Amino acid sequence: MGSLSIWHWIVVIGVVLLLFGRGKISDLMGDVAQGIKSFKKGLQDDEKTAEKPEPVKSIDHTAPPAAAPRTDVGSKVV
């Protein structure tokens, strides 16, 4: 009951051929193959760009010189 016999597959293939026709199925398979090729080409292009790492930028961690204490010109200390 759970497995499909050869007759089930023949009926399914026959229905698919009747619905889509031989020409549409071959065109569809050609489009699928072309899509797979372009996908693989895209993966290879990504790998080529990943092989060229960007130069590492270093950050200088030295502290800036300490600022002199500020005094307000308008206020006077008594």
Curated annotation (Swiss-Prot):
Residues 42-60 have a biased composition (Basic and acidic residues). Its main location: membrane. Residues 42-78 are annotated as: Disordered. GO terms for biological process: protein transport by the Tat complex. GO terms for cellular component: TAT protein transport complex. InterPro entries: TatA/B/E, TatA/E. Gene3D superfamilies: 1.20.5.3310. Signal peptide: none annotated. It is a single-pass membrane protein. Keywords: Cell inner membrane, Cell membrane, Membrane, Protein transport, Translocation, Transmembrane, Transmembrane helix, Transport. It is found in: Cell inner membrane. The chain crosses the membrane at residues 1-21. GO terms for molecular function: protein transmembrane transporter activity. It holds the Pfam family TatA_B_E. It comes from the Bacteria. Belongs to the TatA/E family. Part of the twin-arginine translocation (Tat) system that transports large folded proteins containing a characteristic twin-arginine motif in their signal peptide across membranes. TatA could form the protein-conducting channel of the Tat system. The Tat system comprises two distinct complexes: a TatABC complex, containing multiple copies of TatA, TatB and TatC subunits, and a separate TatA complex, containing only TatA subunits. Substrates initially bind to the TatABC complex, which probably triggers association of the separate TatA complex to form the active translocon. This is Sec-independent protein translocase protein TatA.
